[in-house]
Amino acid sequence: MNRDNTKTNKTVKQEFASFTFVICIALVIRILIMEPFTVPTGSMKATILENDYIFSTKYSYGYSNYSLSFFDFIPLFKGRVFAREPERGDIVVFRPPNDMSVRYIKRLIGLPGDKIQLIDDVIYINDKKIERTEVGTYIGEDGIKYLKFKETLPNGRTYFSYKLAPIFGIISNDRYSNTGVFYVPEGQYFFLGDNRDRSNDSRVNLGFVPFENFIGKAQFIWFSTKITWWDNDIGIINLILKLKPWIESVRLSRIFKNLYNVDE
């Protein structure tokens, strides 16, 4: 009997040790290597849609206090360690300096020391306009029509941006299309959303983003749905009823999509 109890206790200890090891490995991966994020807004549409689930690499820019999951509100250190310089066109997850409780995802356009301006929707970097060509239209899932543009930055990075199509000849959001001049300070960066008319970015409330606030570089979409399923405000019965339409809303074509693929 005692022998059986000893064997049982040993098995429980082994299983607990294995479970603890797996949890530790998962935490190390999330803190230092790769972290999943859910995108709740359409500011990067149509590169990234609402309810896209993305993976970002934590090591791409080194590590700062804000990039360490679960420890980001503890002042462990200042600056970045193992820092690597970001590049124009990177899609970056970061904490906005005006609200450190949330995470933003935007495209990096301006580097420290740059002069940035938008004139008639065209980006000018250090008084030189980037290449920008209209390549078609995009109709969102909400039925809203966008003009689709292919843009190429000075480093050769190419991507698509989107602008609301004119309605009855009226062009929307002129304050987004024509801006003042922005001089990017040292150690800070200028960001834009690919959805140019519907993005809270460096043109308006966001301002410049310190390098220290970078969390990681967005790499690919690993899952995507048209609607959300989990909601803390609804009961278990409603969650069960919502499960089927949630499964049916999965965007299969977006699963494992590379965010830097411009062949589409």
From Swiss-Prot:
Cytoplasmic side: 1-18
Domain of life: Bacteria
Subcellular location: Cell inner membrane
Active site: 43, 106
Annotated transmembrane regions: 19-39
EC id: 3.4.21.89
GO cellular component terms given for this protein: plasma membrane
Protein name as annotated: Signal peptidase I
Source organism per UniProt: Rickettsia typhi (strain ATCC VR-144 / Wilmington)
Gene that encodes the chain: lepB
